[in-house]
Amino acid sequence: MDSFELLEEKIGYRFKDKNLVKKAFTHISFSKSSENYEVLEFLGDALVNFMTVNILVEAFPNKKEGELSQLKSFLISEEFLASLAKSLNFEKYILISKGEELKGSNKNPSILCDVFEAFWAAIYIDSGYDCKLTKSLFEHHFKSQILEMVNSNSLKQDYKTALQEITQKKWKERPIYNVISVEGPEHRKTFTVECLFKDLRTTGKGNSKKYAEQEAAKNMLQIIQDNEKKKT
């Protein structure tokens, strides 16, 4: 029984090219040649994005584009994709240098996320670029988890996490939050918070600092998404 056979059984897909699945789990510290997951991860990033958006559009045909974009931000985040990888014990299959293994890097959310994306790219390529098959397998394993997250209150409200995931992934920077005013009586205060990122600034108001930050982050997310759309 080869090292990936148990995973293949769990997924319900048998790789024709065993080197391809091995490559999907090979960290650059283990192999600095082209035999690591970096290129597969590049393809897998777009593939997982597409399959996730497809689930959202089919499940919520009446949601506005802005709402779907914000939901997608959570569902393709490093943290969430790493949790999907952990649900299939991906950390057990990662090929990594001894030094990185001692540091526990095989459980690092960033690496788990990369491997998760690379794995789906590997299936897509190995199947002869069969998008229908790849999408069917992905939905079989993760559609219920994705929809469960969409319906959870924590996902709907945590715009700060979504914003930080996007800014760190694309620009390697974090937004900054400042309280700019607190008004009203002690029992009914209104907080105004600004969110700063690069040359952008948004504000949010709420009856707590936390809520005001979420509103400011939500507004910043919308601006960034609008700006990205203008570039395409």
From Swiss-Prot:
Location(s) in or outside the cell: Cytoplasm
UniProt entry tagged with the keyword Metal-binding: yes
Catalytic site: D45, E117
InterPro entries: dsRBD_dom, RNase_III, RNase_III_dom, RNase_III_sf
A GO cellular component entry from the record: cytoplasm
Signal peptide: none
Keyword Ubl conjugation belongs to the record: no
Pfam hit, one: dsrm
Top-level enzyme category: hydrolase
PROSITE patterns referenced in this protein's UniProt entry, alphabetically: DS_RBD, RNASE_3_2
Domain RNase III: 4-128
UniProt-recorded Gene Ontology molecular function terms: metal ion binding; ribonuclease III activity; rRNA binding
Major localization listed first in the record, in broad terms: cytoplasm
EC number: 3.1.26.3
Annotated residues for binding of Mg(2+): E41, D114, E117
Superkingdom assignment: Bacteria
Keywords, alphabetical: Cytoplasm, Endonuclease, Hydrolase, Magnesium, Metal-binding, mRNA processing, Nuclease, RNA-binding, rRNA processing, rRNA-binding, tRNA processing
Listed NCBIfam families: RNaseIII (TIGR02191)
Family the entry assigns: Belongs to the ribonuclease III family.
Record's subunit section: Homodimer.
Record's protein name: Ribonuclease 3
